[in-house]
């Protein structure tokens, strides 16, 4: 695991000066813009493969950040993450990078990536909403992607997910090379009140991105009848269609 962070960072840093991205005039040349963004893809897959829950991993990450040796497989994995992130930061500093880590929405990238068991990698570090997803593409039509028997958001819970996200951010931020994390909140689980804002400001998070609905029983807001039971909808529509016109056509 730690070796993967190092190899990934070295590949990014090597690529940085070869993209020619400044040729359009829209971006700074690589000699000026000393930034890359190494992130994480498929965390839910990795945890499943090692029989680790998000809750266990969050606790292990916190222990590692606190300098306490973690226990079991979760503790070993957390230690590998810490070692890998710190070692990758050393590589970035060799290349004089000013920023080197970022966790961003990676759905399109995840669709093109497989884990070591052949399942589609889940986007970034969050648990997915479901174990499979349909992607409707104008080019390829509807395609179904399977994540395998990973933990999904409704099973993980907000607190366990938030702890993993916070503790990973602490690890990245400790390097001094963090961009940030485009963090998706769960609108059907949390309440956006003063307490939420206060806890957010005290956390290591940098930005809120999408507001997602992750629970399986969330209403479909695309339907005007979403708040009604199906039977009520049918009765309502039938009541409109059934009555015969009550008028004197001669009038």
PLM-predicted stretches and their roles:
Residues 1-251:
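Long, C-terminal-biased catalytic regions of enzyme "large/alpha" subunits
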């Amino acid at each position: 695991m730690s070796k993967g962070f190092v190899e990934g960072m070295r590949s990014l840093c090597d690529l940085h000066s070869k993209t020619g991205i400044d040729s359009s005039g829209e971006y700074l040349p690589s000699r000026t813009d000393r930034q890359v963004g190494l992130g994480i893809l498929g965390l839910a897959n990795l945890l499943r493969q090692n029989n680790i829950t998000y809750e266990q991993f969050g606790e292990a990450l916190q222990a590692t950040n606190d300098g306490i040796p973690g226990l079991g497989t979760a503790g070993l994995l957390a230690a590998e993450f810490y070692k890998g992130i710190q070692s990758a930061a050393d590589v970035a500093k060799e290349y004089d990078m000013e920023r080197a880590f970022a966790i961003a929405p990676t759905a399109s990238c995840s669709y093109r990536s497989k884990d070591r068991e052949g399942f589609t990698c889940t986007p970034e570090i969050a648990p997915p909403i479901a174990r499979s997803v349909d992607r409707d593409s104008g080019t390829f039509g509807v395609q179904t992607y399977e994540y395998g028997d990973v933990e999904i958001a409704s099973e993980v819970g907000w607190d366990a997910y938030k702890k993993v996200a916070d503790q990973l951010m602490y690890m990245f931020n400790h390097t001094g090379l963090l961009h940030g994390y485009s963090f998706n909140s769960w609108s059907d689980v949390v309440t956006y009140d003063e307490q939420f804002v206060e806890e957010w400001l005290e956390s290591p998070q940098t930005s809120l991105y999408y507001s997602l609905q992750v629970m399986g029983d969330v209403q479909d807001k695309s339907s005007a009848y979403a708040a009604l039971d199906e039977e009520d909808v049918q009765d309502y529509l039938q009541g409109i269609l059934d009555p015969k016109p009550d008028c004197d056509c001669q009038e």
